[in-house]
């Protein structure tokens, strides 16, 4: 099929649950032909695609935003294996899975929730970035207390977090109350 050329500048779509996908690296400026809409687009998605068909070609952010890529390829952009609280409406989960750019983690990405809604993904962070966010630090501490880690080991682990390292935290913000949430993943 022929690729349709676009000549007017294109403003990136807005994503409620991933407000800065260029800043997080999930979308990059790279002119490509989108496999879904077959148009030349100035940006491409670099995050995970969960689909039966292996999709190695570029998907544009516009086809993620309008849900056409998810529909066309029976795909999601975040793994559906994470637990969604009962108070989160199904349409919110659908928006995160099918109309929001995902992100790449070390082992298993998960989308955090708060106040009956999905939280906004702000990006990977390290110890220096979470140092001034006591609510995010508390979330990390609580996560590792759940694994029965002693307090001193948790604090040592938090100090090793690096946004580009082998242990990384992923920062979110509640869209209702503004609390910062985080979880850590490591290789």
Curated annotation (Swiss-Prot):
Q: Name the Pfam families for this protein.
A: UPF0167
Give the residues annotated as coiled coil: none
| Protein's GO biological process | symbiont-mediated suppression of host innate immune response
In terms of superkingdom, the source organism counts as: Bacteria
* Disruption outcome: Grows normally in liquid culture, traffics into host (human and mouse) acidified compartments early after phagocytosis, suggesting it no longer arrests phagosome maturation as well as wild-type, impaired growth in mouse macrophages.
Its biological purpose: Probably plays a role in host phagosome maturation arrest.
The similarity annotation says: Belongs to the UPF0167 family.
Q: What is the recorded name of this protein?
A: UPF0167 protein Rv2295
């Amino acid at each position: 099929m022929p690729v349709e050329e676009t000549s007017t500048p294109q403003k990136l779509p807005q994503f409620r649950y991933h407000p800065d996908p260029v800043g997080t690296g999930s979308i990059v400026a790279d002119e490509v032909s989108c496999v879904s809409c077959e148009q030349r687009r100035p940006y491409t998605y670099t995050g995970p695609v969960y689909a039966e068909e292996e999709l190695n070609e570029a998907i544009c952010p516009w086809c993620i935003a309008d849900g056409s890529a998810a529909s066309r390829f029976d795909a999601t952009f975040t793994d559906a294996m994470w637990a969604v609280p009962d108070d989160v409406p199904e349409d919110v989960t659908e928006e995160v899975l099918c109309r929001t750019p995902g992100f790449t983690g070390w082992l298993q990405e998960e989308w955090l929730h708060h106040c009956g809604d999905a939280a906004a993904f702000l990006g990977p962070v390290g110890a220096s970035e979470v140092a001034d966010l006591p609510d995010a630090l508390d979330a990390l501490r609580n996560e590792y207390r759940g694994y029965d880690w002693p307090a001193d080991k948790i604090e040592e682990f938090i100090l090793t977090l690096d946004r580009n390292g082998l242990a990384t935290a992923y920062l979110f913000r509640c869209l209702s109350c503004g609390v910062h949430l985080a979880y850590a993943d490591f290789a």
